[in-house]
A protein has these predicted regions:
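Conserved segment of the helicase C-terminal RecA-like domain
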Residues: 41, 67-107
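Residue-level signature of catalytic and energy-coupling elements of molecular machines
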Residues: 15, 43, 60, 77, ...
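Helicase motor core with emphasis on the C-terminal RecA-like subdomain
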Residues: 1-49, 56
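Short hinge/gating elements
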Residues: 58, 86-90, 123-131
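Conserved nucleotide-binding/hydrolysis micro-motifs of P-loop NTPases
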Residues: 1, 22-24, 47-50, 65-69, ...
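Non-catalytic terminal extensions of ATP-dependent helicases
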Residues: 110-159
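Hydrophobic side chains in well-ordered alpha-helices
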Residues: 4, 30, 72-75, 100-102, ...
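A short beta-strand element within the Helicase C-terminal
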Residues: 50-65, 87-91
Length: 159
């Protein structure tokens, strides 16, 4: 999975990894970047299949075939939520077949076709300080506006 993330980053995609082998703070940062639009690709294990409530996930790509129907449903359930639409893609090699529980799928061959990455709408700035350090959101916004030449509208969420 990390290999896939590194490849996507080398191809100029804003990708983050999310898996159980990561430290909790790194998982939280990856999710924050994905939720806030600072990264538009989240490469994950089944850890993301349950319990994540992220709106507007438009695409799910299954790189490894799910072991069973329940896993497929939970993985795919991250898209098309709240009456929105979503797309599910399954990458299979020449020797693999799509399991019956997935049903009929349209076939699409890439054949070396290059997809240009879409730049994220935002960039994450991590400041490892907070209330304990007597640093609040207003201070951060003021600093970014005064020293960075930004307006309040240029600054997204401050968490």
């Amino acid at each position: 999975m990390e290999r896939i993330r590194k490849y996507l980053v080398s191809e100029k995609f804003a990708a983050e990894a999310y898996h159980g082998g990561m430290e909790q703070d790194k998982r939280e940062r990856a999710l924050y970047k994905f939720r806030s639009g600072c990264c538009n690709v989240l490469v994950s294990t089944d850890l993301a299949a349950r319990g994540l409530d992220i709106p507007e996930v438009r695409h799910i790509v299954h790189y490894h075939l799910p072991a069973n129907e329940e896993a497929f449903i939970h993985r795919s359930g991250r898209t098309g939520r709240w009456d929105e639409t979503g797309n599910i893609y399954i990458i299979v090699g020449p020797e693999e077949h799509v399991p019956e529980f997935i049903g009929e799928a349209a076939e699409w061959n890439v054949d070396g076709e290059r997809i240009n990455p879409v730049s994220p709408a935002w960039v994450t700035l991590y400041i490892g300080r907070g209330k304990k350090d007597k640093l609040n959101k207003v201070d951060i916004l003021g600093f970014l506006c005064k020293k960075g030449g930004l307006t309040a509208k240029d600054v997204g969420r401050i968490d």
